[in-house]
Amino acid sequence: MSTRRDLPQSPYLAAVAGRKPSRVPVWFMRQAGRSLPEYRALRRQHSMLAACFEPEVACEVTMQPIRRYHVDAAILFSDIVVPLRAAGVDLDIVADVGPVIAAPVRTVADVDAIKPIDSQSIAPVLDAVELLVAELGDTPLIGFAGAPFTLASYLVEGGPSRHHARTKAMMLAEPATWHALMTKLTDLTIEFLLGQIRAGVDAIQVFDSWAGMLSLADYRQYALPHSARVFATLAEHGVPMTHFGVGTAELLGAMSEAVKPGTAKVVGVDWRTALADAAARVQPGTALQGNLDPVVLLAGWPAVERAARAVVDDGRRAVDAGAAGYVFNLGHGVLPQTDPGVLTDLVSLVHSL
């Protein structure tokens, strides 16, 4: 049973559901994290993974950008590899590298060794959600997970990869092993997101960070069916669902197909694709989210203001072209060197437009 709140005044929830919001809603991927001095102070006492499994710490980090920026949505502080850790995978998040897997998954036996997760193994994450639901007031909470393809890539490569060569080799040369791995990861992702929904998140986002490395044909064959099963299983719970990847211009239409009609669905767009162009690629009834280049935030306020105004105008053109709604965001996560004051001013600007 969901403990989800009724938030009829939320601009974010209105936009993603295809209703007219009271203002352009804005939040930022990685709004909670390395750009905030209060986060860096807290991290001196906790590793990244430890923070994800400490409910009070995860709650505090999630709340920090809400207090500072007054964004229209909170996103749970976590990491896409958290459910892998809960499933018994030996991994760490290494500074300036990312997730590193101690024993990469290369064989059927490796796939078989991945354990399922349950509410007990992710209890600290769900406890953090419940703390946040009690503290956020009228601000909606977005839960999230990594898409099966992106999780598989980390497991097979052993960490971040430029070419994803081992991942693609398994896909193409050992499709049975590949789909067995993807089936396990799909089950894991579903359980992780269902737990968050039952604990009270108001929306979810699935990050397919590495999907842009695939051709459209390979994406449709090796990744989309598994992501679609995640969304199909969650659809009955009625939460808005966002599908996001980087470098996915040619995949946007297929990504929008993962969420079936009748559900509030959003596709995230990176800075390489105009929002109005994205509106022509996605399925009818799809809202869009994006897509300011995060690097623009390092270029000084005149450049930020100029670019942000252009993005909001593009978002409005996208709605005129058929997008169900529009949410302002970056095209990827906030960079660590970003001045928090710029983000505060950016939120105020977007709200004024």
Swiss-Prot record:
PROSITE patterns: UROD_1, UROD_2. One of its GO terms (biological process) is protoporphyrinogen IX biosynthetic process. Keywords: Cytoplasm, Decarboxylase, Lyase, Porphyrin biosynthesis. It catalyses: uroporphyrinogen III + 4 H(+) = coproporphyrinogen III + 4 CO2. It is found in: Cytoplasm. Catalyzes the decarboxylation of four acetate groups of uroporphyrinogen-III to yield coproporphyrinogen-III. HAMAP family: URO_D (MF_00218). This is Uroporphyrinogen decarboxylase. It comes from Mycobacterium ulcerans (strain Agy99). The gene is hemE.
